[in-house]
């Protein structure tokens, strides 16, 4: 079941759902708008000959922060990691789905490549997989609305929520745009 605006507000008011900083004007009929943080991870395409998800490649990305009051410019065909300004904390019986903003999609901005699902129990910034599929650069302003978080009620609380030792969670408590940790549980079989 998708939560409505009144259900989202109720979950926040009793402290079960955390969105920090929270701005009530960001609540939509069935989602909460989230904003773009000011840090980005860009790929160092001269450090490695290829990306191998089986290997730890610590220098694959570099953290970039635009100058105060300046945007980050995402060029056509470029892919970078960003993150939400908000830290989101989900209880064990709510899952999240991050969706892009329609107005930004119409400009050629993709908010996530594949990872739009947020497990129950997750807490941290949500990493964004930002791509420009337009033929012109797109300016990304820290603090701008970048997506919307939809919340789904589970049929029961997760037995092993994200962050539990049984779940094998790699990104619990992440701050800022977090690079891939695929190598931690990579399996060739």
Curated annotation (Swiss-Prot):
Keyword NADP: no
Function: Bifunctional enzyme that catalyzes both the deamination of dCTP to dUTP and the hydrolysis of dUTP to dUMP without releasing the toxic dUTP intermediate.
UniProt KW Nucleotide-binding keyword: yes
Entry annotation: catalytic residues: 129 (proton donor/acceptor)
Pfam family of the protein (one): DCD
Record's subunit section: Homotrimer.
Catalyzed chemical reaction(s): dCTP + 2 H2O = dUMP + NH4(+) + diphosphate
Family: Belongs to the dCTP deaminase family.
CDD domains in alphabetical order: trimeric_dUTPase
EC number(s) per entry: 3.5.4.30
Positions contributing to dCTP binding: 101-106, 119, 127-129, 148, 162, 174
Residue span of region Disordered: 163-189
GO BP: any one term: nucleobase-containing small molecule interconversion
One MF annotation (Gene Ontology) recorded for this entry: dCTP deaminase activity
Keywords annotated in UniProt: Hydrolase, Nucleotide metabolism, Nucleotide-binding
Matches recorded under SUPFAM superfamilies: dUTPase-like (SSF51283)
Pathway assigned in UniProt: Pyrimidine metabolism; dUMP biosynthesis; dUMP from dCTP: step 1/1
Class in the EC hierarchy, top level: hydrolase
Protein name per Swiss-Prot or TrEMBL: dCTP deaminase, dUMP-forming
């Amino acid at each position: 079941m998708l939560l409505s605006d009144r259900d989202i507000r109720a979950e926040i008011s009793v402290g079960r759902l955390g969105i920090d900083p929270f701005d009530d004007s960001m609540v939509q009929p069935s989602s909460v708008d989230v904003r773009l943080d000011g840090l980005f991870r860009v790929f160092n395409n001269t450090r490695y000959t290829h990306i191998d998800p089986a290997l730890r490649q610590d220098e694959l990305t570099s953290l970039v922060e635009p100058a105060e009051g300046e945007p980050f410019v995402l060029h056509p065909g470029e892919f970078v990691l960003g993150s939400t300004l908000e830290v989101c904390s989900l209880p064990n019986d709510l899952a999240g789905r991050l969706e892009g903003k329609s107005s930004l999609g119409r400009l050629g901005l993709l908010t996530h490549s594949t990872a739009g699902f947020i497990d129950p129990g997750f807490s941290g910034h949500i990493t964004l997989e930002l791509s420009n599929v337009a033929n012109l650069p797109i300016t990304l302003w820290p603090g701008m609305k970048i997506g919307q978080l939809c919340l789904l009620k589970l049929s029961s609380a997760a037995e092993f929520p994200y962050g539990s030792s049984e779940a094998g969670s790699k990104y619990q408590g992440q701050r800022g745009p977090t690079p891939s940790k695929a190598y931690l549980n990579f399996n060739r079989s």
